[in-house]
UniProtKB/Swiss-Prot annotation:
<keyword id="KW-1278">Translocase</keyword>
<keyword id="KW-0406">Ion transport</keyword>
<dbReference type="GO" id="GO:0000331">
    <property type="term" value="C:contractile vacuole"/>
</dbReference>
<dbReference type="Pfam" id="PF16886">
    <property type="entry name" value="ATP-synt_ab_Xtn"/>
</dbReference>
<comment type="subunit">
    <text>V-ATPase is a heteromultimeric enzyme composed of a peripheral catalytic V1 complex (main components: subunits A, B, C, D, E, and F) attached to an integral membrane V0 proton pore complex (main component: the proteolipid protein).</text>
</comment>
<comment type="function">
    <text>Catalytic subunit of the peripheral V1 complex of vacuolar ATPase. V-ATPase vacuolar ATPase is responsible for acidifying a variety of intracellular compartments in eukaryotic cells.</text>
</comment>
<dbReference type="InterPro" id="IPR024034">
    <property type="entry name" value="ATPase_F1/V1_b/a_C"/>
</dbReference>
<dbReference type="InterPro" id="IPR005725">
    <property type="entry name" value="ATPase_V1-cplx_asu"/>
</dbReference>
<dbReference type="GO" id="GO:0005524">
    <property type="term" value="F:ATP binding"/>
</dbReference>
<protein>
    <recommendedName>
        <fullName>V-type proton ATPase catalytic subunit A</fullName>
        <ecNumber>7.1.2.2</ecNumber>
    </recommendedName>
</protein>
<keyword id="KW-0547">Nucleotide-binding</keyword>
<keyword id="KW-0067">ATP-binding</keyword>
<dbReference type="GO" id="GO:0046961">
    <property type="term" value="F:proton-transporting ATPase activity, rotational mechanism"/>
</dbReference>
<dbReference type="GO" id="GO:0009617">
    <property type="term" value="P:response to bacterium"/>
</dbReference>
<dbReference type="InterPro" id="IPR031686">
    <property type="entry name" value="ATP-synth_a_Xtn"/>
</dbReference>
<dbReference type="GO" id="GO:0046034">
    <property type="term" value="P:ATP metabolic process"/>
</dbReference>
<dbReference type="Pfam" id="PF02874">
    <property type="entry name" value="ATP-synt_ab_N"/>
</dbReference>
Amino acid sequence: MSKNSGLPSFASTEADNSQGFVLSVSGPVVIANQLAGAAMYELVRVGHNQLVGEIIRLEEDTATIQVYEETSGLTVGDPVLRTHKPLTVELGPGIMNNIFDGIQRPLNAIAEITKGIYIPRGINTPSLNRTIKWPYQPDTKLKVGDNVSGGDIFGQVVENNLIIHKIMVPPKEMGTIVEIAPAGEYTLDHALLTIEFDGKRKQLTMVHNWPVRSARPVIEKLPCNYPLLTGQRVLDSLFPCVQGGTCAIPGAFGCGKTVISQSLSKFSNSDAIVYVGCGERGNEMAEVLMEFPELHTKVGDKEEPIMQRTCLVANTSNMPVAAREASIYTGITLAEYFRDMGLNVAMMADSTSRWAEALREISGRLAEMPADSGYPAYLGARLASFYERAGRVSCIGHPTRIGSVTIVGAVSPPGGDFADPVTAATLGIVQVFWGLDKKLAQRKHFPSINWLISFSKYMQALDTHYDQMDPEFVPLRTRAKEILQMEEDLSEIVQLVGQDSLGESEKITIEVARIIRDDFLQQNGFSPYDKCCPFFKTVWMLKNMMTFYNLAQKAVESSTADNKVTWNQIKNELKEIIHRITSMKFQDPTDGEQTLTAHFSTLNEDIITAFRNFSDLV
């Protein structure tokens, strides 16, 4: 009898006669025999503690199993129970505002059961709370005798003020409605809809299961055309992502990957967030758990905690290595489920490097042929199959709806080396690359995104959208990028011969580039006025900086040889204007769009007037 005998276990609920026996144990990899008829990726329970495992290789009646829990204490001859199903997640009300481990065990519920801070081995508790009664409202258009198929919405549950949970027919089910439950409060296991197909009746509840390694079906993938607004000026203006896009954030330790991931979770224009902490420090998840409940978003006149639209999957670095792979798949399956309701979901994976390291460790124990840096040869294929589950799609079922999953994957290359196999493979897959720079981070320039190596392939897809919002934005962005590139080209000359040897036009370029770097690209994520920058503020800041640059260049170019205008003259005469331009970031968005627009518009007019007066003086 195991020492956790008082806890719910698998054997007490789903034990099966099909059983094999452990042959060998090597860390998280267990080899068992007498498992003829088992399937690849079938879930098994290993040992007397019934540890969760997954079959990853089959040879005759011998199976190689990766175990998602600590394997110390397993011995040769221990039983291995088959479950006849793959690793699945439970999908239904109660996912949001919850924290799971890599195989969707609810950490809050386990803490209440065990009254401790550790997860006992082999514990088998339902992922979603079966005792809560949810207010269910059936779809009034459906009636007995109607035909339904996978993806059809037959009711809804108001999970909280941010998420209205649509209850759907599971993707592989279909039939004729025999019975419909009336509106009321029900638990997850209560039958809400009874359907009949081919003479067999099936009762549908609020919850259904889905295998994590299979993508949920869709009608078709659609082109992405709406930006994912992050609240970070450098990302929204220079390297935008779309809802349904794929992004990578590679960077060395201390560059701010986690802060960017967390600010995306806090301030992006997504309807739901799935945050997967995959192999990172436990303190980072603790930080999220402490900060998120205090953050609020406005819904109508009320403030609501953003934790209500967030689901956390925590698989920290001290948890079993094999479960890191499962946590990524668990996260993306949860995200696809909310996408099928017609929501725009953002999934943060922090970090995919730790997942790749788990693949490398298990691959090594399986004695597979190593490729670059010891990673398995199928690393690129695994990464691609994960990122390909992102996208904007037309969902199956009725009524027709469009949803999206955006994947933002943080990558931690050792020593910040972007030639690392994981970073190189990720770069070939993703459409947006936000490269973090150690030197910028050391200069305390945050977010430390290097504007010279980062890129976004969604620029053209979003140009139509930007033209509708503000026709001036695209030319402004192009001009700002040119100035930053020119500054980089001039920096070598400045280092060799000094800034005084440059022409006046180049001096203006260098100074305006410095203003863009320090007062536009740099952003204090911990200040109330700058933690989130709305898009209108970003555009106005860029507009005023470019207006100043264009007028300064014009003043220098139009001056005559005997009355040459210099940068020093402009700087001395327009000191107050330059100070106001550099102080634009201090305008607080909570004052409202009208107030800020009026302020920036006045500044724009003042810049034009100041240069007009300056040219009259000269």
